[in-house]
A protein has these predicted regions:
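Electropositive, glycine-dotted interaction segments
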Residues: 1-11, 22-23
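Active-site-adjacent bridging/hinge elements
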Residues: 13-16
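Switch/communication elements of ASCE P-loop NTPase nucleotide-binding domains
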Residues: 19-154
């Protein structure tokens, strides 16, 4: 239902490839906006029955081309896939907003026990360690905050107080 509000049309295959139909208009799916494609892919997989219980979806920074508001919607859809269909998700992100949205919707839908969160720790020489932070999400948020604080400080040092 949430996907239908964002991507209200349908998809089909033609000799030209994948097409999107909405209100009698046909559009080559490759011409969809980059952010819309993430929603479209999930919708197509659901519509064709390719996403079902025990499906493993690997999503590498799916929020990277999404407005923060759409990141929140996409996070909720991902959480609902886990809750309603039993889908397994392997997800990476560098977005504090998206991370918080995933965490918030998991709490809202009471599926905290169906997740694990890991954070990379740089060991040097190109090696990293994956640290389980499932029970300490604040560690992730604190690390994100360091970078935001750093750039805010730079911004403030070059901003005239009268312009603020």
């Amino acid at each position: 239902e949430k996907l239908d509000k964002i991507i209200p049309g349908t998809f089909g295959k033609t000799n030209d490839g994948l097409v999107y139909y909405k209100d009698g208009v046909r559009l080559n799916a490759s011409n969809l906006a980059t952010g819309s494609k993430m929603f479209a892919i999930i919708k197509m997989l659901l519509d064709t029955g390719r996403i079902k219980k025990q499906t493993l979806l690997v999503l590498d920074e799916p929020e990277s081309h999404l407005h923060p508001q759409w990141q929140n919607v996409f996070a909720e859809i991902i959480v609902l896939l886990v809750k309603e269909l039993g889908v397994k998700i392997l997800l990476t992100t560098h977005s504090p907003n998206f991370m918080l949205a995933i965490d918030a919707f998991m709490r809202k839908y009471n599926i905290n026990d169906k997740s694990n969160f890991y954070q990379t720790k740089n060991l040097g020489d190109g090696f990293v360690e994956y640290v389980d932070v499932t029970n300490n999400m604040e560690k992730i948020y604190q690390d994100f905050l360091v970078y935001l604080t750093e750039v805010k400080s730079i911004h403030d040092s070059f901003t005239d107080p009268e312009d603020a």
